[in-house]
Amino acid sequence: MRKIIIPIITILLIALDQLSKLWIVKHIELNQIKEFIPNIVSLTYLRNYGAAFSILQNQQWLFTLITIFVVCVAIIYLMKHINGSYWLLISLTLIISGGLGNFIDRLRLGYVVDMVHLDFINFAIFNVADSYLTIGIICLMIALWKEESNGNHN
């Protein structure tokens, strides 16, 4: 059952990321900021030619190689551990979805669409795929910690 559910969830997560970016591009002009939840979140449309949180600008070839490598490793690890813990499956699904969501932008547009601006903190503008990656890495750390504390060293 997991072999069916996980690809479906991955496709749905990528679709949500791509639809959110499409909506932003259609409804907000480049570099314009629109208040979404007052004093908490604004939406904007930025073109990010770098990595997550706009680091390493204009290094598309590097991000393409890194993304292909990370996504392939995550897929292989997921397939080998398909019966693993839910934390592990969630983390890898989020990492794969986030990596592919931004990869699609890079291939299609030459940049990644970023849109979420946190008004209450000075933080980089990011997108849904970046959120998947961040949450996925946190879940992976939890999965590895739980595995370590249970003495399960596969």
Curated annotation (Swiss-Prot):
Pathway: Protein modification; lipoprotein biosynthesis (signal peptide cleavage). Its EC number is 3.4.23.36. InterPro entries: Peptidase_A8. Signal peptide: none annotated. The active site is at D114, D130. It is a multi-pass membrane protein. It is found in: Cell membrane. This protein specifically catalyzes the removal of signal peptides from prolipoproteins. This is Lipoprotein signal peptidase. The gene is lspA.
